[in-house]
Amino acid sequence: MKVHRMPKGVVLVGKAWEIRAKLKEYGRTFQYVKDWISKP
């Protein structure tokens, strides 16, 4: 599972179940993708 933060978005690389789990995990912390990519 790899997570690449780009200036305008996020690229998730992995199996479908890994990506769904990671999105749920980040969904608890960040409400919007904008918040996720602006975080240092």
Swiss-Prot record:
Assigned keywords, A-Z: Sporulation
Q: How is its activity regulated?
A: Highly effective in inhibiting polymerization at low and intermediate concentrations of GTP and only partially effective at high GTP concentrations.
GO BP? sporulation resulting in formation of a cellular spore
Domain of life according to the entry: Bacteria
Task of the protein: Blocks Z-ring formation in the mother cell during sporulation by inhibiting the polymerization of FtsZ. Binds to the minus end of FtsZ and functions as a filament-capping protein. At high concentrations, is capable of both capping and sequestration of FtsZ. Decreases the GTPase activity of FtsZ.
The organism named in the record is: Bacillus subtilis (strain 168)
Upregulation: Expression is regulated by the mother cell-specific factor sigma E.
Q: How does it assemble?
A: Interacts with FtsZ. Binds to the C-terminal polymerization interface of FtsZ. Binds to FtsZ filaments.
Q: Fetch the Pfam families from UniProt.
A: MciZ
Segments spanning the bilayer are: none
| Protein name listed in UniProt | Cell division inhibitor MciZ
